[in-house]
């Protein structure tokens, strides 16, 4: 019984921490372009973003696949909350913007081979914008948790952030699914460039060991195996900024 309550308290605590740090709503769109249509699709999204900004929406943040998963674009649309985004006035303005873009709607359909959408709660918009403004290289990890293991997965992501912080590396932004695609949680690490992303390999082994143990891991080599205890699916992608 004591063990049960200890686990219960841990799970509640982890979920409460999640609720406190992931309060901003985003729509996340993953897109694979039809063959030969990627650049045209990027231009279409840029035109739509300009029209939506004029209608009062926040500018999206996005990236282009370099290697890893099969999507070409990951687009983060800042919503704030469902109440804000679906306010009748906002909806009417977006509808008017869509009408001005009617000529491009068929092009969108022809340029997209695959699309997946997810509504997720994530970090404060100002923090994410600052990171994207200073970074041009991204590491995206997307997860489906094993049944009953979501809180453990979330805690593991925070442990990896503690490890990164101790080594002076960027911490991952954590996003938690609300509805849509199957991903329970995904993280985005933002780096200046490929060299910045790879510089952790230059950290002395002793410092890595110390940071890993301080974060709650047995050793740096056990970070991956520890993560795998909690997940059924894990996709890794490296991506670059779209300006």
Question: Which stretches of residues belong to each language-model region?
Answer:
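Hydrophobic h-region of N-terminal signal peptides that target proteins for export
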Residues: 9-18
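A periodicity- and composition-biased signal for non-globular, repetitive helical segments
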Residues: 8-9, 147
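Short S/T/G/P-rich N-terminal loop/turn motif that feeds into the first structured element of a domain
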Residues: 18-243
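Positively charged n-region of N-terminal signal peptides that target proteins for export
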Residues: 1-4
């Amino acid at each position: 019984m004591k063990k049960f309550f200890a686990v219960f308290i841990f799970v509640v605590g982890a979920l409460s921490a999640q609720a406190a740090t992931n309060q901003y709503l985003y729509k996340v769109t993953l897109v694979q372009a039809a063959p030969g249509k990627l650049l045209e699709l990027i231009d279409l999204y840029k035109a739509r973003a300009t029209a939506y900004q004029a209608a009062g929406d926040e500018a999206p943040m996005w990236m282009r696949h370099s290697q890893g998963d099969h999507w070409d674009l990951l687009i983060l649309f800042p919503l704030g909350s469902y109440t804000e985004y679906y306010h009748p006035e906002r909806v009417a303005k977006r509808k008017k913007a869509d009408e001005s873009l009617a000529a491009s709607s068929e092009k969108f359909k022809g340029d997209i081979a695959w699309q997946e959408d997810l509504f997720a709660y994530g970090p404060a918009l100002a923090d994410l914008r600052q990171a994207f403004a200073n970074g041009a290289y991204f590491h995206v990890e997307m997860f489906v948790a094993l049944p009953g293991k979501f809180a453990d997965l979330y805690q593991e992501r925070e442990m990896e952030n503690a490890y990164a912080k101790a080594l002076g590396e960027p911490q991952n932004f954590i996003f938690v699914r609300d509805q849509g695609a199957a991903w329970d949680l995904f993280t985005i690490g933002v780096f200046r460039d490929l060299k910045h992303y790879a510089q952790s390999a230059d950290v002395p082994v002793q410092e890595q060991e110390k940071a890993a143990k301080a974060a709650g891991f047995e050793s740096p080599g056990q970070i991956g195996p520890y993560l795998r205890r909690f997940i059924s699916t894990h996709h890794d992608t490296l991506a670059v900024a779209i300006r």
